[in-house]
Amino acid sequence: MVELFAHIEKDIGPIEVVVFNIGANVHFSILDTTERVYRKVWEMGALAGFLTGREAAKVMIPRKRGTIIFTGATASLRGSKGFSAFASAKFALRALAQSMARELGPKGIHVAHPIIDGAIDTDFIRDNFPERYELKDQDGILNPEHIAEQYWQLHCQPRDSWTHELDLRPWMETF
């Protein structure tokens, strides 16, 4: 991870925005969740978030500016039956974002944690959940471009009104 950030800074330029957007939304009963599955989901969702956030902070602090966005999910707020590994990783990522926001905010770094609550228009949804994809024409599925616009708005916010957490969901998604 250290080498990745150094390479980007050297070859592309200063890193202004980092988006950590990974998750393994696996569905297993708690009795069927193996230690290996639980550990891998946690490593991908929580540990990798920590490593990404730490390295982003290291390059942003000297410039006293930057934005780190950790994408959350409904599971960041509440666990659901069969999603113990995913929910615990997302809970951990949310706590990390809160801690980093408190530590890095005074140093000029905006840390945000948007909650994505709903299906996103992707090939995965089209191929595996056609019934969800059918809701697209009813604005019942999140458009990735619209999510990106909200993330950009987070980055552009003035320091006196930073948003830490917001929910993004289609109008028909219950909450």
Regions found by a protein language model. Give the residues of each.
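Conserved amphipathic alpha-helix within the SDR
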Residues: 1-13
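Active-site loop of short-chain dehydrogenase/reductase
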Residues: 14-15, 29, 60-73, 106-109
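Conserved NAD(P)H cofactor-binding loop of Rossmann-fold oxidoreductase domains
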Residues: 21-27
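Substrate-binding pocket helix/loop in short-chain dehydrogenase/reductase
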Residues: 29-30, 37-39
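A short, exposed helix-loop element centered on a Lys and neighboring polar residues
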Residues: 53-54, 98
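Catalytic loop of short-chain dehydrogenase/reductase
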Residues: 67-92, 98, 102-106, 120
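C-terminal helical subdomain
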Residues: 106-117, 132-175
